[in-house]
Amino acid sequence: MEKRIRALKAIILVAVMVVELFGVDAVRVVAETFKVTENTTISKEDDRDYAVTDCTLTVSSTGNITGTVYGSGGKIVNQGSINRIERNIEVDNQVGATIQDLQSSVGITNAGHIISATYSSISTLTNSGTIDTLNVNNPGFSDSAATVNMNAGTISSLNVMNYTGLNPI
């Protein structure tokens, strides 16, 4: 019993030290991020952050994620609204759907509305919807020119960040 009490005291001490070192927000981010490892559908308003790993997260037309979705492989199918998407995840933003801020390094398909998107030029973006601001990062590798397939969509503002001096588009 005494070993269990000592172990519990050690865990509490570590938690206190983490809070003192990084602040309450660091603990809150880790504690409030919901890990998704199998296909999941969100159909209501949700303020949690999601970490998606090698599966599909679907946000239905009644779904609204006000937090951030972090990708590590896998795919997001958005039919509703998502505040922010970051990292390595494929995105399918469907008709009537909205994404406020998209930072992705994998293929993007947009038929809805994206307020702001930043993507790596080694990926393909297919747009038949509306993108208010598109930022393209060209890493400067050979054959790293951006591919933007436009079916019937609009891009209001296009910004290209080129790290080699070459014209990436």
Positions of predicted regions on the chain:
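Bacterial N-terminal signal peptides that target proteins for export
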Residues: 1-12
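Intrinsically disordered, low-complexity regions enriched in serine, threonine, proline
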Residues: 1-3, 25, 84
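Bacterial N-terminal signal peptides
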Residues: 11-23
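Sec-dependent signal peptide cleavage junction
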Residues: 21-33
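Extended beta-solenoid/beta-helix repeat architectures
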Residues: 31-169
